[in-house]
């Protein structure tokens, strides 16, 4: 492990020597070769899918693991979008001149070596590698063993392009150890690794956060809420709620709990019930919800703490926006929260008082995504407050240094 990381660290200096045009060219070649190697990648993915079915993995995990030609094309297109982004390295973030004539510039630079730990989504391999490369960082990728074959096929494609361009393949590396011990070693290698970004289940995030000596930016669980206020447009509210839950239930920006204002519960809950029925969504409600919808399941305290990642929804009736905010404060994960209302004052209160990376008015939480935000892609959605928060694009994979230009000044 140490020898592997030492080689990765040594390769970082190569990225400092190439300009934005070269990085763009390499990434466009990677995108082309991902499409050219589609058959190889899909064959590898089919091996992973067969093993996943044998292991009876959840439908959410299998959905994230699955690749088809459309998803492979989407991976390639994501790399192209990253290639076309403005180079985040070398930006002058601030600058000033002191009274003694010293000129100071605050300039963006790469972080260095970034370890990314993730589970069953093969597209993270290409996205993370491309984002790190574009931002001048070496990437150490630790995917889940359930996606081993897919990740290896994608990484081999990327490394072949690097070598064709006389760049070390170690700029993008898969951690060779897929075990828990491999993660344990990686997160303690602060001599070689500058940042760890874990994305996955709650257990993984907690383990990494509690045991790492390398700095960590967490991609924690997405226990997302939508609150339907008494001043909501009902048609808008129903459409947003259904989209937030059922469009893709297995992702971190899907809604897990729906909060409904007591003042409108009788009418809106019936509309919501009819809207969710065609999607076969399992609804679980509090006592007040069950007064209106007696046939649904009862929501337990544990349900309100649960990120289902399935087509299951908890519903709670609350006494206005104050209680909605309090509920989110208690159960939310700091990811994405939404309010549906036509009342500007209520909307602003919610936006200002809810503590989350992304807070929405009259829109689905499903929009929390680096690609949607215009970042090209994301390496994760940070629920940290430092050093990055929300969808992490290439600018969030940089730090800065101060460059000071003098003409012989000495300090008196």
From Swiss-Prot:
SUPFAM superfamilies: ALDH-like. It comes from the Bacteria. One of its GO terms (biological process) is L-proline biosynthetic process. It catalyses: L-glutamate 5-semialdehyde + phosphate + NADP(+) = L-glutamyl 5-phosphate + NADPH + H(+). It is an enzyme of class 1 (oxidoreductase). Pathway: Amino-acid biosynthesis; L-proline biosynthesis; L-glutamate 5-semialdehyde from L-glutamate: step 2/2. Keywords: Amino-acid biosynthesis, Cytoplasm, NADP, Oxidoreductase, Proline biosynthesis. Catalyzes the NADPH-dependent reduction of L-glutamate 5-phosphate into L-glutamate 5-semialdehyde and phosphate. The product spontaneously undergoes cyclization to form 1-pyrroline-5-carboxylate. This is Gamma-glutamyl phosphate reductase. It comes from Nitratiruptor sp. (strain SB155-2). The gene is proA.
């Amino acid at each position: 492990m140490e020898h592997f990381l030492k080689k990765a660290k040594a390769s970082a200096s190569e990225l400092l020597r190439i300009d934005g045009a070269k990085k763009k060219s390499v990434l466009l070649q990677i995108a082309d070769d991902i499409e050219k190697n589609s058959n190889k990648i899909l064959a590898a993915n089919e091996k992973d899918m067969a093993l996943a079915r044998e292991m009876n993995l959840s439908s959410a995990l299998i959905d994230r693991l699955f690749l088809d030609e459309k998803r492979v094309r989407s991976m390639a297109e994501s790399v192209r979008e990253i290639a076309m982004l403005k180079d985040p390295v070398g930006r002058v973030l601030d600058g000033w001149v002191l009274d003694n004539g010293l000129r100071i510039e605050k300039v963006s630079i790469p972080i260095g070596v970034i370890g990314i730990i993730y589970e069953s989504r093969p597209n993270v391999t290409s996205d993370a590698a491309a984002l790190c490369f574009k931002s001048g960082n070496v990437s150490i990728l630790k995917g889940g063993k359930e996606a081993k074959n897919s990740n290896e096929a994608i990484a081999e494609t990327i490394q072949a392009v690097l070598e064709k361009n006389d760049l070390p393949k170690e700029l993008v590396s898969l951690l060779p150890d897929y075990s828990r011990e491999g993660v344990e070693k990686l997160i303690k290698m602060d001599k070689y690794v500058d940042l760890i970004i874990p994305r996955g289940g709650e257990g993984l995030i907690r383990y990494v956060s509690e045991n790492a000596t390398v700095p960590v930016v967490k991609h924690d669980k997405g226990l997302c809420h939508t609150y339907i206020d008494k001043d909501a447009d009902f048609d808008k509210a129903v459409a947003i709620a259904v989209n937030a839950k059922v469009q893709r239930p297995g992702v971190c920006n899907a809604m897990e709990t729906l909060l409904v204002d007591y003042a409108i519960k009788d009418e809106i809950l019936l509309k919501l019930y009819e809207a969710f029925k065609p999607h076969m969504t399992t609804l679980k409600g509090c006592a007040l919800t069950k007064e209106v919808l007696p046939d649904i399941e009862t929501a337990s305290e544990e349900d309100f703490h649960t990120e289902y990642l399935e087509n299951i929804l908890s519903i709670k009736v609350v006494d206005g926006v104050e209680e909605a905010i309090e509920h989110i404060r208690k159960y939310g994960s700091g990811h994405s929260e939404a309010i549906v209302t036509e009342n500007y004052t209520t909307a602003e209160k919610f936006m200002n008082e809810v503590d989350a990376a992304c807070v929405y008015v009259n829109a689905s939480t499903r929009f929390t995504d680096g690609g949607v935000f215009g970042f090209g892609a994301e390496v994760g959605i940070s629920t940290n407050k430092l050093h990055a928060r929300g969808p992490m694009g290439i600018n969030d994979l940089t730090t800065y240094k101060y460059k000071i230009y003098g003409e012989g000044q000495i300090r008196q």
